[in-house]
Curated annotation (Swiss-Prot):
Belongs to the insulin family. It comes from the Eukaryota. This is Insulin-1. It comes from Xenopus laevis (African clawed frog). The keyword Lipoprotein does not apply. The lineage of its organism: Eukaryota, Metazoa, Chordata, Craniata, Vertebrata.
Length: 106
């Protein structure tokens, strides 16, 4: 009986220190919920919404091509697929985990 009483605090610590299963479940996160989740996961590191390739391409398209800038930016099929996987597509249109959210941290 004494051994049980000595092990009880350890069992309680292990029980309460295991991650909540709800936090590990993939979730749909859209709008302000997505931004709040990113702030929570990334903290002071900050975050971005799109992969760097897409941001570079959007900037070139907004400013317009100069001296054939877009010639060097032709996308391969793999790169095009990466562009389609922004955080909204990954976490709002589909579901994402905390680990996937963390991939958008700076």
């Amino acid at each position: 009986m004494a051994l049980w009483m000595q092990c009880l605090p350890l069992v309680l610590v292990l029980f309460f220190s295991t991650p909540n299963t709800e936090a590990l479940v993939n979730q749909h996160l859209c709008g302000s919920h997505l931004v709040e989740a990113l702030y929570l996961v990334c903290g002071d590191r900050g975050f971005f919404y799109y992969p760097k390739v897409k941001r570079d391409m959007e900037q070139a398209l907004v400013s317009g091509p100069q001296d054939n800038e877009l010639d060097g930016m032709q996308l391969q099929p793999q790169e095009y697929q990466k562009m389609k996987r922004g955080i909204v597509e990954q976490c709002c249109h589909s579901t994402c985990s905390l680990f996937q959210l963390e991939s958008y941290c700076n």
